[in-house]
């Protein structure tokens, strides 16, 4: 399988981006050992928009590695999305999917990457209970509800969702070795 790894880690403020870079490297190591072909982009290091479009055409699956900043992706990841996906019109998506015969139906079905998949690998300082416990901050709804927009932007291209990987408590109670072991197990289960 051809897998594109997108590293959205960024040094900014009190965040140094190191955990996301470390998880990105672990994914490359594990997926290569499993026999997959891997291409990668460290978003904050810069990228060529046309080369990134070609990577999306090449890949069978993309893994978005990123921290949560203020309940969503860092601005550098959003900029990458705006530049790469918008310029991918005609290659990554044809249209929004609607037709003049019935313009109220079919929105989001114009993607050209059907059969390909996406996965999120996220780092949060929030404890897992903030996502899973009723009455807690995220009302027991889980992390994927917060990332519906992100899943939908991938779906707009035609990609289907793979199970999300989540590291919790990354500042207050970091467990880096456990995160790496859990991520390896997750990758082996999903891509093994």
Curated annotation (Swiss-Prot):
Which E.C. number(s) belong to this protein? 1.6.5.10
Root EC class: oxidoreductase
Subcellular location(s) per record: Cytoplasm
Write down the required cofactor(s).
FAD
Report the catalytic activity: a quinone + NADPH + H(+) = a quinol + NADP(+)
The entry's FAD-binding residues are 15-22, 68-71, 107, 123-126
Q: Tell me, what does this protein do in biology?
A: NADPH-specific quinone reductase.
Q: How does it assemble?
A: Homodimer.
What's the protein name? Answer: NADPH:quinone oxidoreductase MdaB
- Naturally occurring in which organism (per UniProt): Haemophilus influenzae (strain ATCC 51907 / DSM 11121 / KW20 / Rd)
Gene (name only): mdaB
């Amino acid at each position: 399988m051809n897998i594109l790894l997108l590293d959205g880690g960024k040094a900014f403020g009190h965040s140094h981006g190191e955990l996301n870079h470390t998880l990105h490297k672990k994914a490359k190591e594990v997926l290569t050992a499993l026999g997959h072909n891997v291409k990668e982009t460290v978003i904050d290091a810069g990228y060529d928009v046309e080369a990134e479009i070609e990577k999306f055409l090449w890949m069978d699956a993309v893994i978005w590695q990123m921290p949560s900043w203020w309940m969503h992706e860092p601005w550098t990841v959003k900029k990458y999305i705006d530049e790469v996906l918008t310029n991918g019109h005609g290659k990554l998506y044809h249209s929004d999917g609607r037709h003049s015969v019935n313009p109220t139906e079919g929105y989001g079905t114009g993607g050209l990457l059907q059969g390909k998949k996406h996965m999120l690998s996220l780092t949060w300082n929030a404890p897992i209970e903030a996502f899973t416990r009723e009455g807690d901050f995220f009302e027991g709804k889980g992390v994927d509800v917060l990332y519906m927009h992100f899943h939908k932007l991938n779906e707009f291209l035609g990609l289907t969702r793979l199970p999300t990987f989540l590291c919790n408590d990354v500042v207050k109670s970091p467990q880096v070795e456990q995160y790496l072991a859990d991520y390896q197990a997750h990758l082996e289960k999903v891509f093994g």
